[in-house]
Amino acid sequence: MGGLPTEATIAHVLVSKYADHLPLYRQSQILARAGLDLHRAVLADWVGKAAFHLKPVVDRLTDHLKRSSKLFMDETTAPVLDPGRGKTKTGYLWALARDDRPWGGEDPPGVVYFYAPGRAGQNAETFLTGFDGILQIDGYQGYNRLTKPTRKGGNPIRVAHCWAHARRKLNEVFDRDRSEIAAEGLRRIAGIYAVEADIRGISPGQRLSARQTHSAPLVAAFGDWLQAERRKVSAKSRLGEKLTYIHNHWDGLQTFLADGRVEIDNNRVENMIRPIALNRKNSLFAGHDEGGIAWGRIASLIETCKINGVEPFAYLKATLTAIANGHPQNHIEYLLPWNFKPSS
């Protein structure tokens, strides 16, 4: 097959790989059945070039998110081929997300995935340069450096920890040991979540008032219960380890009580990590670190399209066409997914 691919063809390859999780070798096989001889190396080259040209759009999306008052962050593995060894190494994709819909925020939701060759906390510190808001995270210790006065790239960040992770820790013990203490902890956490179900979608001020009235006493009682139970069990036991985990994150678990914009858990960004896991399962690994970077960039635009109700193929086709036609760099904002207007 000679000639250059159209923007529609490239968009189709990108959406097939990163939205439909169809590996390039399978796309090549499907095209071959239609009489089109396109080796997966050719498709990979298209993906890399598309990611290069889409970089300014992803950079602008990143800047937009970093201006937010509150963001979510989570990370997941992204296996990458290590050319020097002929084996795979473990890279990571870090998701930085905004979703203010639960409290009626006006900024559109979005997510950016950053690739790094490791999980070190300095990667999160680098990605978050310029962000000084509240960060909702899980209990990974690598984030601790973000809260210190020595943080590079901004002021110390205030963190909000995840009650879903606390619940998960207790659930692990209950499922394995049928611990009555774990069961009691789960009942108490369910009461805190019941308040959240009642206040979803109302204003931050209303959420804060309801939490101060209803949630704060429940959280305080949970804290007293937690300390009492920790004194009863060995810190080295399975239950003791889970209770210690909750204790170590106690300050961050209370952040939601003081700010109606903060969620009770990190589930929003965890949902945005799932497409990465699906792609990892089907494609097994990226070809190199640059492939991991391309994966992050394209997934950023596709997933931001999806959470804004924008059709990814139409968006990518139009955006690649605009870039090919010389879209001005000082108007990149118009190419963000939530500004896309499909042609009639």
Regions found by a protein language model. Give the residues of each.
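Catalytic center-proximal scaffold of phosphoryl-transfer enzymes
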Residues: 1-344
